Amino acid sequence: MSKKYEGPSMMEELWEYVKMIVFVVVIVFIINNVLLINARIPSESMEKTIMTGDRVFGNRLAYMTKDPERFDIVIFKFPDDESQLFIKRVIGLPGETVTIKDGKVYINDSEEPLDDSFVAETPVGDFGPYKVPEGSYFMLGDNRNHSRDSRYWINSFVEKDKILGKAVLRYFPSPKLIK
């Protein structure tokens, strides 16, 4: 007489579920702490590019082998309180001098202002000059008249090692690549 197959025991099946849950938790941990950073936009400082309440993913590996470039949108630790994450656009690069005249941004005494076609409304005001230290960056929001950015911080510059990632995708409320 042959013995009837009964399948795995309840404990064996439970153990398989536990292993699967642990595997998923480890994968999510790796994705969230090594590959991606998840951020919510708390203010209007980046509007019209990214709106208040949007959720974005940043690529944590973007600056492992290269430096941030002008106009990259980055997620970083706020220099005046590193417990807060900010998202802004890179404007001034290491070693440059940034001056803002009548709301227009000039780099190193250039006669031509930077392209600001992404700015929400015509910016106002004069600021600077700001001499960006080596290894640091000068940040501005796209909604310049409503942005708390490098112009107003006690520590005006963001060190490269405080940049956590390059914003690449808005995933809520609807998916959109960030440029």
Give the role of each language-model region.
Residues 2-15, 30, 34-40, 48-179:
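Soluble "head" domains of membrane/secretory-pathway proteins
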